[in-house]
Every structure is written in structure tokens, then in C-alpha cells.
């Protein structure tokens, strides 16, 4: 079982811990609980440790064209310093994983897949990569922290960080003396940011964030609230709304497919499904009342 570099912090807070994708991670914290943590993010701000998320790099001449042949979305549609939600499919249209691709340049990309699928994502890309492309698993090299909620900018601004970046854009900033990748992304449906410090700097950055949310009545939040927040927003989770048996078209995630690209892994099957061959399609339901 893997543990977060912040594991001792969670244990000290008496967090309820559980296996999440092969990682022992905090689900909720005493004195608050999932509902209170959920409300804090919707109304104020919350911070999350999501260091279980995967990290990988794809580098080399032609990395842009290579990834565009593998991933569903069109990376030519974003510029350097931007990120994109995308999927890696099998030749039969199933989803190996959904992930965020950070574009540093045409020959340099950073990927953030899901925890339990990182090894599979790296293996698929390595098996497809030409000699000049290097795909590296960096899962243990970085932590991932999230600051989510309408007051998220105030948290970072109190630490001297410029928060005026576009949605899905990223920058390199300094927090607690550490170099951090700051991206205007999240998994809650609220205004927010995700931060990637090196593992060795995770505790210092976390402590700075934890101190900064106190004047705003923010909360430290677990993965239980993250799941209810993403469900309320309608975001898919691999293994549930997306899987090797559920395609992007069937999961109503066709918006993350670059339909005008020449081809990519699974493109023939997905194109046929889009044209009407899909036998099923997930739909969201909104509860109007309790019950």
C-alpha cells in the first residue's frame, strides 16, 4: 500500500483513512465529515491531498504528434502553458484512463492520470512510442494538492501568488520556498487550483495552505467530499462512469474527443458509435427534492 507524503499530517488529524487506488488516503476528517467538507468547498474553500494521482512525462521531438495519435482530444487546440482533459482508449474504444495533459511545449508534456491506472497509461504509451520519444513514470516524484472553492484565489493571494490565470492554464510559482506547478483546474465544479510540488516539498506547501485557509473558515477535506462534489457536478470517475467497458461516447464524454483528427487509438469504433452504433449512453439525473 502506498502512502502520501502527507500521511503523517492526516494521521495527526485523526482522519478516516482508506484504500483509494492502492493508496492509503484520507476520506474525511473528524469534527467536520463529508457533508461539512462538501459545503465548505461550495461556500468558502477547502484543501485536498490528492497525491495518489499519477504523474508522467512524455518528451522528445514529435511528442505533440505522438500524443495526438494516442489520446482522444486534440492537443493542437491548446498552447504552451495550457492543460487539456483527454482520454486514452483501447483499439476497441474502451477507456484505459482519463487524464489531464499539461503542454510545456511541442516536445514536452506532463500527464496526470488516475492513481490505479498510471502504470497502464505509461505502459500503453511506451509500447506505442517511437525511439525518439521517452515516456517516464513520475508517480512518486510529485505530490498533488488542490485548493477548491470560491475563496480559493484569496488563499493563494495571501501567499503572494498571482491567481489571474485562465481556466486550464498553468504557471510555475513559489510557495514556502518550493517550486510548484499551479494549474487552474479541479474536480469539484468550483473555482479552484491544483498544485504540484516535488514530494520533498509537499509538507511545507501543505502547511502553508492549511494556515492560509484558517482566516477564511476553510476546511481540510478528504476524498469522500471530493467524490460527492464531482458527482454533483457530473464529472466522471474511471471505474464508474468510464471504464474499459464504457467508451467516451457511451459515457457522454464525446466533448473530450477530437473528432476532426485523422486517427487515434479507438477512433474507428468511437466514430461508428457517434454515428449511431452505440447501444447505450449515460445520462445525468437531477434530484429536485430529498428522497
Task: Please describe what each predicted stretch is.
Residues 79-95, 163-176:
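Conserved alpha/beta core surface patches that mediate binding of polyanionic ligands
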Residues 1-29, 37, 102-291:
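Conserved, structured C-terminal
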Residues 69, 77-79, 88-94, 99-105, ...:
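Short, charge-rich binding segments
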Residues 42-43, 71, 88-90, 205-206, ...:
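Short, intrinsically disordered/low-complexity patches at protein termini
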Residues 1-86, 94-96:
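Acidic, proline/glycine-enriched N-terminal capping motif
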Amino acid at each position: 500500500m502506498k502512502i502520501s507524503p502527507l500521511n503523517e499530517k492526516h494521521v495527526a488529524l485523526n482522519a478516516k483513512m482508506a484504500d483509494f487506488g492502492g493508496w492509503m488516503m484520507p476520506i474525511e476528517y473528524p469534527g467536520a465529515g463529508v457533508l461539512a467538507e462538501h459545503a465548505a468547498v461550495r461556500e468558502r474553500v477547502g484543501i485536498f491531498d490528492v497525491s495518489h494521482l499519477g504523474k508522467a512525462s512524455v518528451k522528445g521531438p514529435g511528442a505533440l504528434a505522438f500524443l495526438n495519435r494516442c489520446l482522444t482530444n486534440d492537443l493542437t487546440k491548446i498552447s504552451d502553458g495550457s492543460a487539456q482533459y483527454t482520454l486514452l482508449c483501447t483499439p476497441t474504444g474502451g477507456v484505459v484512463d482519463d487524464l489531464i495533459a499539461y503542454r510545456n511545449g511541442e516536445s514536452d508534456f506532463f500527464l496526470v492520470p488516475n492513481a490505479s491506472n498510471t502504470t497502464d497509461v505509461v505502459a500503453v504509451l511506451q509500447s506505442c512510442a517511437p525511439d525518439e520519444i521517452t515516456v517516464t513514470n513520475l508517480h512518486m516524484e510529485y505530490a498533488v494538492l488542490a485548493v477548491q472553492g470560491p475563496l480559493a484565489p484569496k488563499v493563494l493571494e495571501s501567499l503572494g501568488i498571482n491567481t489571474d490565470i485562465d481556466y486550464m492554464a498553468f504557471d510555475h510559482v513559489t510557495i514556502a520556498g518550493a517550486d510548484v506547478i499551479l494549474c487552474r483546474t479541479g474536480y469539484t465544479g468550483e473555482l479552484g487550483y491544483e498544485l504540484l510540488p516535488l514530494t520533498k516539498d509537499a509538507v511545507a506547501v501543505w502547511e502553508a495552505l492549511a494556515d492560509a485557509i484558517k482566516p477564511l473558515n476553510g476546511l481540510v477535506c478528504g476524498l469522500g467530499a471530493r467524490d460527492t462534489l464531482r458527482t454533483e457536478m457530473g464529472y466522471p470517475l474511471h471505474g464508474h462512469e468510464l471504464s474499459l467497458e464504457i467508451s467516451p461516447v457511451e459515457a457522454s464524454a464525446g466533448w473530450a474527443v477530437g473528432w476532426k483528427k485523422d486517427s487515434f487509438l479507438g477512433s474507428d469504433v468511437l466514430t461508428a458509435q457517434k454515428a449511431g452504433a452505440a447501444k447505450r449512453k449515460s445520462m445525468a439525473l437531477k434530484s429536485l427534492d430529498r428522497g
